[in-house]
A protein has these predicted regions:
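Short amphipathic alpha-helical segments with heptad-repeat character
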Residues: 118, 122-129, 133, 140, ...
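A helix-coil-helix interface module used to build multimeric assemblies
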Residues: 1-202, 207-214, 220, 275-276, ...
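Conserved helix-loop functional segments at active or binding sites
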Residues: 145, 182-185, 189, 218-222, ...
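Generic, well-ordered alpha-helical scaffold segments in large soluble proteins
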Residues: 41, 62, 66-69, 91, ...
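Conserved hydrophobic residue
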Residues: 51, 75, 264-265, 380, ...
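Glycine-rich cofactor/substrate-binding loops
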Residues: 2-37, 98-99, 280-459
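Acidic, glycine-rich loop-and-beta core segments that form the ion-binding/anion-interacting portion
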Residues: 216-308
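Alpha-helix capping and helix-loop boundary segments enriched in small/acidic/polar residues
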Residues: 104, 109-112, 156-163, 167, ...
Length: 459
């Protein structure tokens, strides 16, 4: 059992205690970040004259050889080490001797693990950003191709007003755009280096924390050594942002599941993103969308877990904080997988434009426009609302739609109606006369698509 402590103990650690306490099974995930931090630390120590240049070079060479061997599969990270820090240090000492024992000068595992976690989260935020951006590109492409794909918009899962598929996809574009902004915000707030904070009270060595921070492209050093090692609010922020991404993916998945059903038939999911049944040969199931929806709770659970872990911990570091890693690693991997699969699914999905438009023609999605027609002819809106309500009731009784009513039937309910009512309530007219920015009309949506392209090219 390789440990970085033990001098003041008279007994060996109980095997059960060792296994319970060890984190090597999961913190090996930031092996590369641990080495990155150690290389920066050693470089700074030599700059400050705490290590010689020769010692620095020997240690750096040793660290590079460890990375090369691990990456090549020649060196295995095993459970005989308590954590990734002890794995790196023990192997370094084996390779370079006494120089390796100086690696930890002016450093505690508390600031070391805080640094590793920040480096890891920072790297993963950049990967998540790429995935969200690609999803935005996919959405904008669908928008551009479907400016005239008419469909019903819904409230309460009931047909409400006619829109376009471009407009519907645009709603999700805005959601994921904000998700991307949240990731950027987190990156900016967390991008300060904790290295040099020690266990909680800094160190007596003349460290150059600004230099260490610059070597790893941080904005600068953190300004309170206790806060540096004692908080994981950036992890909580990340898990909150990931939960919001998953909430958006889950809502989108729910709609795709509904749209893919035989009752709606708005879309057909590609075979590559569908599965079948072991007993029912006719089935083609939207399992990817269902799994994305299901995995949302998994990410929510990670957020609630770290919030609960951190809520009662006195300053500074406590071992409870070791519990931040597995759930964060899992949440990040889950969201990355969901984003990639979801992007592939919607980019290959077939939209049934004729079914969508036909659906918009039924269900009285043009009722609001019939009321607006009356208002434009001098009828107060509240009266117009009541008149159109009676029209809908009449149509329901007759089993017809508003555009199937004769002019005589219209006039029986209100003499204001004339022949131009039919153009006013045509689904395409209903959509296209909505031209303000943010509305579903094709001219308005063209502008949005171009704004989206500009945003994606600049960000």
């Amino acid at each position: 059992m390789a440990q970085l402590w033990g001098g003041r103990f008279t007994k060996e650690t109980d095997k059960l205690v060792y296994n319970f306490n060890a984190s090597i099974g999961f913190d090996q995930k930031f092996f590369h970040q641990d080495v990155q931090g150690s290389k920066a630390h050693v470089t700074m120590l030599a700059k400050q004259g705490i290590l010689t240049e020769n010692e620095r070079d020997v240690i750096l060479k040793g660290l590079d050889s460890i990375v090369a061997d691990v990456d090549a599969g020649k060196l295995e990270i095993t459970s005989e080490y308590e954590d990734i820090h002890s794995f790196v240090e023990a192997n370094l000492i084996d390779r370079v001797g006494d120089a390796g024992k100086k690696l930890h000068t002016g450093r505690s595992r508390n600031d070391q693990v805080a640094l590793d976690m920040k480096l890891y989260v920072r790297d993963e935020i950049q990967e998540l950003d790429k995935l969200v951006k690609h999803l935005l590109e996919t959405l904008n492409k669908i928008m551009e191709e479907n400016l005239h794909t008419y469909m019903p918009g819904f409230t309460h899962l009931q047909k409400a007003q006619p829109i376009t598929l471009a407009h519907h996809m645009g709603a999700y574009f805005e959601m994921f755009k904000r998700d991307r902004s949240r990731l950027s915000d987190i990156y900016g707030r967390m991008n300060y280096c904790p290295l040099g904070s020690g266990a909680l009270a800094g160190t007596t060595y003349p460290l150059d924390r600004e230099y260490s921070a610059s070597l790893m492209e941080f904005e600068g050093p953190t300004l309170n050594s206790m806060d540096s090692v004692a908080d994981r609010d950036y992890v909580i922020e990340l898990l909150s942002a990931l939960s919001t991404i998953m909430m958006h993916l889950s809502r989108f998945s729910e709609e795709i599941i509904i749209w893919n059903s035989n009752e709606y038939r708005f879309v057909e999911i590609d075979d590559a993103y569908s599965t079948g049944s072991s007993i029912m040969p006719q089935k083609k199931n939207p399992d990817i969308a269902e799994l994305v929806r299901g995995k949302t709770g998994r990410v929510y659970g990670a957020l609630m877990s770290i919030l609960t872990t951190m809520k009662g911990i006195p300053l500074a570091y406590n071992k409870d904080m070791q519990e931040d890693k597995e759930l964060t690693f899992d949440a990040i991997d889950t969201v990355k997988g969901c984003l990639a699969l979801f992007d592939g699914m919607i980019s290959t999905m077939k939209f049934r434009n004729d079914v969508m438009e036909d659906s918009a023609k039924h269900g009285f999605t043009n009722a609001t426009d019939a009321a607006d027609y009356l208002v434009n002819h001098g009828v107060p809106f509240r009266d117009a609302h009541g008149i159109v309500g009676r029209l809908v009731l009449y149509c329901l009784d007759k089993g017809i739609s508003l555009d199937e009513m004769s002019l005589e039937e219209y006039k029986e309910i209100s003499p204001v109606f004339e022949n131009d009512i039919y153009d006013a309530i045509s689904i395409r007219t209903c959509v296209e006369k909505r031209m303000t920015i943010g509305a579903p009309g094709s001219e308005a949506m063209k502008k949005v698509v171009e704004l989206n392209k500009k945003y994606l090219s600049e960000n």
